[in-house]
């Protein structure tokens, strides 16, 4: 019988009204962690693994719910694509926490649970477990796009890949269909974990604490104050509504510029009768890649801030705000680097190498930006914090990381993240002016070099034409030579 998934309309309705559900999931997570921490070391491993899966599912639902609420609250095309990417990344990261990929699947929570079920030898439980396992394997192997997860959470050395993948997300319906499939599997898993929980309590002698558990809800409560301050009576929201379409057009223009550079490179490689080197072309591609990185940062931050301003609870606000850490870290890894290895291969290192040595204005601005970037990296714990906010499963220790992830979300300081955003915007402002001047300078130098090179090569062609015309070569050879020289001249004059 064909499986019946929840309809897209049903999912959309649930998401639109999920503000309370997000808070309820947060409360359920905190209560479960409090109960487990109150149990002594005799807690059965079956109970521990079952609740690792249960809390993982709750966090996944909460995380996806936050992105979906933001998705349905905006009408801007780029912003929708940003949240669609995050829905897909959350599905991928959630699946990774439960079933994992490749060789790491051996240590996945669902497979660790299988080891426990084999020991208790309950045919009904094992049968139900195996049915869900087959669904998970099919979904993970055939429905998840791991590339979009990586490009969303890490960006890429070649930002044009991020652009192409982002531009390909044109259908909310396709993403919602995928979510419906995943949602259905999660619901089956929830039912199964509830059944296992009852079985464990009935058959292992586990007794949950009867006394009232002291649950600490540690999420930062300053979000409403910060939102009021930064929005400044709606001015920030209005500014975002202006920035998003303008910045999206600029992103598209820069991507088209990058594509044109690639076409020129391809044409020269395929059509030139001899090897022609244009180092300036490579420099312009590096600058275009850098520009794409910075523009993605600005657009992604604007999308996050808008979602943050529309958050209805502190936990929803914190879950949105954690994207700032992800965006900042992803940008700085590629732009500047947090260690020697990253800095050596960074975009900034490449840019520094072709700043004209005699342009004091550019060199002074380069140093000012360098100082800002260096300070931003030196004073941060971004990479560790980012990892704690994203990864729900620790591949190294083969254990759930959901509790640590939630704690990281809770302690996010909105005031500090606001300062981080302002610093990133200041860097963007200076970078934009700097790269524009550098591109103009390189283009001017390239024109001058091209003109000088053209004159030199055209003089040689003229000399060769004169020699062949004055020679005793046959008319056919002369005609063939003229055609070849014409073709070379046309390429030179491109």
Kindly label every feature range from the protein language model.
Residues 147-150, 154, 384-391:
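Long, charged low-complexity segments
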Residues 1-144, 159-380, 396-494:
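Amphipathic alpha-helical interface segments
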């Amino acid at each position: 019988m064909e499986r019946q998934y929840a309809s897209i309309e049903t999912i959309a309705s649930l998401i639109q009204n999920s503000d309370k559900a997000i808070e309820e999931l947060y409360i359920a997570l905190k209560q479960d962690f409090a109960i487990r921490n109150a149990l002594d070391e005799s807690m059965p491993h079956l109970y521990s693994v079952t609740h690792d899966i249960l809390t993982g599912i709750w966090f996944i639902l909460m995380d996806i719910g936050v992105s979906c609420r933001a998705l349905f609250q905006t009408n801007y095309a780029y912003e929708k694509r940003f949240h669609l990417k995050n829905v897909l990344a959350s599905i991928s990261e959630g699946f990774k926490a439960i079933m994992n990929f490749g060789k790491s699947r051996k240590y996945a929570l669902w497979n660790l649970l299988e080891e426990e079920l084999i020991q208790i030898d309950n045919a009904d439980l094992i049968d139900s477990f195996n049915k869900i396992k087959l669904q998970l394997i099919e979904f993970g192997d055939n429905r998840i796009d791991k590339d979009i997860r990586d490009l969303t959470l890490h960006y890429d050395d070649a930002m044009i890949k991020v652009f192409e993948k982002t531009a390909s997300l044109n259908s909310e319906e396709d993403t919602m269909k995928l979510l419906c499939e995943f949602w259905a599997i999660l619901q089956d898993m929830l039912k199964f974990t509830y059944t296992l929980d009852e079985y464990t309590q009935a058959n292992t002698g586990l007794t949950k604490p009867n006394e009232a558990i002291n649950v600490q809800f540690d999420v930062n409560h300053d979000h409403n104050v910060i939102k009021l301050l930064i929005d400044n009576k709606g001015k920030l929201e209005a500014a975002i509504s202006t920035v998003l379409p303008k910045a999206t057009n600029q992103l598209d223009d820069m991507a088209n510029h990058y594509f044109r550079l690639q076409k020129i490179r391809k044409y020269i490689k395929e059509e030139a009768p001899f090897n022609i080197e244009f180092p300036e072309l490579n420099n312009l591609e590096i600058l275009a890649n850098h520009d794409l990185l910075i523009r993605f940062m600005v657009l992604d931050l604007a999308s996050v801030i808008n979602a943050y301003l529309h958050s209805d609870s502190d936990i929803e606000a914190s879950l949105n705000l954690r994207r700032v850490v992800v965006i900042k870290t992803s940008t700085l890894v590629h732009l500047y680097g947090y260690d020697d290895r990253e800095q050596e291969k960074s975009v900034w290192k490449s840019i520094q190498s072709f700043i004209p040595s005699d342009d004091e204005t550019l060199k002074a601005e380069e140093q000012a930006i360098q100082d800002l970037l260096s300070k931003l990296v030196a004073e941060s714990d971004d990479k560790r914090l980012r990892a704690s906010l994203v990864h729900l499963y620790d591949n190294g220790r083969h254990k759930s990381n959901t509790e640590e992830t939630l704690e990281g979300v809770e302690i996010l300081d909105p005031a500090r993240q606001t300062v981080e955003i302002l610093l990133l915007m200041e860097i963007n402002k200076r970078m934009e002016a700097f790269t524009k001047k550098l591109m103009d300078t390189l283009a001017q130098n390239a024109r001058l070099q091209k003109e000088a090179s053209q004159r030199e090569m055209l003089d040689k062609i003229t000399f060769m034409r004169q020699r062949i015309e004055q020679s005793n070569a046959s008319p056919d050879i002369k005609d063939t030579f003229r055609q070849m020289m014409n073709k070379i001249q046309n390429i030179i004059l491109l």
